[in-house]
C-alpha cells in the first residue's frame, strides 16, 4: 500500500545535557519513570525525551514490537537515532509547514475560499454549502463535512482516512463529502483536511511535501534522517506518514517553545504560531484545537496552590506525542507501540502527570 521516501539531513543537531536538578526537576526524575514502568502504570513505550531550556534532561529507549504505517516491522531495540512512526503528529508538523509557506507567499491565507486552491474540482465547489468552506475551516478541522475516523477503526476500510487512501482520487474523495454541520462550529477529526493542506503546500511551493519540509524545517533545525510514507498514488501522507527520531521531534518542540526561532534564526513566523495555538473549536471537555494543534491545560502543584498551566500538543495513533509547556519551556516527545488500542492515551498522560510534572520543582 505504501512505500517510504528517504530523506537525510545535512547534519544532525546535537543536544547539550543537564542533570534533572540543574533543570528544575527533582533528582529522582528517572526513578519516577522506572517506577511507573515497573508498576505497569505505563506500557509499550518505545522512546521518551524530556528537554528544558534547550537541554536534554531525560532520554530513555526500550525494545518493542513496531509497525510502519500498519506494516509489521518486528521487534525493534530502539536507540537515539531510530526513526519511528509519528502517525498523526505529522498533521501538526504540516500545520507548521503551511505557516512557513504562507510567509513565503506560496499559499493562500486562511480566509481564502477552499475551492480557489482546487480549480480542478469546480464541479464540487459549485455546491453552495461547499462554496462556503475556507482554509480556516480546513486548518482547524471544522469543515463540517461527513467524515469519520473516530468511531470506525483504522483496520476497517469504512474508516474515512482509509477510504481516502484507497480512493482513485484522494482529493475528490475529500472534497465531495457532504457538508452536514455548519463550518467553523464543530470539530471533526479529519486526515482529509490535512491532506488538502499538503496538496496546497506542494502545489504552491512547486516542491514535494517531504522535500519542502526538509528544506525549510528539518535542515534548519539540524534534524537527522526522516522518512515520509507515501500512499498508493505516490503522494506523501500529510495526515500520518512522517517517521522521525524522538530527539528530532523534541527539537521541533524546543523551537516552538522558543517562539518559532532556533539558534537566532526565524523558522516559523511568530504570528503563525499565535494562530496555531489560539483555540478555534473544542475537541471535548478538556481539549481545544487551533490550526492543526491540540491545546489544553495540566494541573500543576497541589491544593490549595494548584494552578492550570497550558500545553500545546501533537498526537498520533499508538501513543505518539509531542507536548510543549511554554511557561516552563519544557518539551516532551514520546513514541510508543499501542497502535489502535482504546487505552493508548493512558501511558502518555501518566508520563506527563506522574513523571514530568510530579518531578517539577
Regions found by a protein language model. Give the residues of each.
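Short, charged, amphipathic alpha-helices and their helix-cap/turn boundaries
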Residues: 32, 60, 69-74, 113-116, ...
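Active-site SXXK
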Residues: 54, 82-110, 138, 197-201, ...
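Structured C-terminal helix/loop/strand segments within mature extracytoplasmic catalytic/sensor domains
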Residues: 314-361
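Active-site Gly/Thr loop motif
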Residues: 224-226, 277-331
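Active-site helix/loop module of the DD-peptidase/beta-lactamase fold
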Residues: 80, 85, 104-145, 176-178, ...
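Active-site-proximal alpha-helical segments within enzyme catalytic domains
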Residues: 193-200, 240-261, 320-336
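Short Gly/Pro-enriched turn/cap motifs at secondary-structure boundaries
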Residues: 38-40, 127-128, 162-163, 185-186, ...
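N-terminal leader/targeting segments and the immediately adjacent pre-domain N-terminus
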Residues: 1-73, 102-108, 140, 163, ...
